[in-house]
Amino acid sequence: MIDDDGYRPNVGIVICNRQGQVLWARRFGQHSWQFPQGGINPGETAEQAMYRELFEEVGLNRKDVRILAATRNWLRYKLPKRLVRWDTKPVCIGQKQKWYLLQLMCNDADINMQTSSTPEFDGWRWVSYWYPVRQVVSFKRDVYRRVMKEFASVVMPLQESTTQRNTPGYRRKRG
């Protein structure tokens, strides 16, 4: 499904742990890393697509995560000309994406990149929050920067509470 401007509707998924780190996934058989993402099927809402992609790409179900935020607007990136499939109709020139920030509620061991016969990823790791902006392929960098900036106000308190808990002499206030 390609829109009138040539963009494929898509969802992107940022999964964070309780320390505010984000899941960074290695594309199958490649040396490139990215967040999970995937197309929205006809008749599917963005949220439904997000849960489907979440299972297909990282083996997690709705019960394994909690939605913390979603981008207010669709974010777009253009594909480099060398990646555009000019022989398809309609021609897809890029992706327009709705992004979701999820908190992992299960154990790391529940993450499974092998739920599909054609997996998207063959490895993953936790990285610091801003790391993906510097490391993602260049044509996605602006979208990643915008996503992470929009979600930062939600994730930063997670990092601060972890830092406080790990500080010698820190005591949680009660009641």
Curated annotation (Swiss-Prot):
E.C. numbers: 3.6.1.-
Location of the Nudix hydrolase domain: 6-149
Swiss-Prot/TrEMBL keywords: Hydrolase
Entry's Gene Ontology BP terms: mRNA catabolic process
Leader sequence residues: none
SUPFAM superfamilies the UniProt entry points to: Nudix (SSF55811)
GO MF entries: mRNA 5'-diphosphatase activity
Pfam families for the chain: NUDIX (PF00293)
InterPro entries on file: Nudix_hydrolase, NUDIX_hydrolase-like_dom_sf, NUDIX_hydrolase_CS, NUDIX_hydrolase_dom, RppH
Top-level taxon in the UniProt lineage: Bacteria
Short sequence motif Nudix box: positions: 38-59
CC cofactor: a divalent metal cation
GO cellular-component term (any): cytoplasm
Family, as annotated: Belongs to the Nudix hydrolase family. RppH subfamily.
Entries under PANTHER family matching the protein: M7GPPPN-MRNA HYDROLASE
Known role: Accelerates the degradation of transcripts by removing pyrophosphate from the 5'-end of triphosphorylated RNA, leading to a more labile monophosphorylated state that can stimulate subsequent ribonuclease cleavage.
Protein name from the UniProt record: RNA pyrophosphohydrolase
Naturally occurring in which organism (per UniProt): Erwinia tasmaniensis (strain DSM 17950 / CFBP 7177 / CIP 109463 / NCPPB 4357 / Et1/99)
Gene encoding the protein: rppH
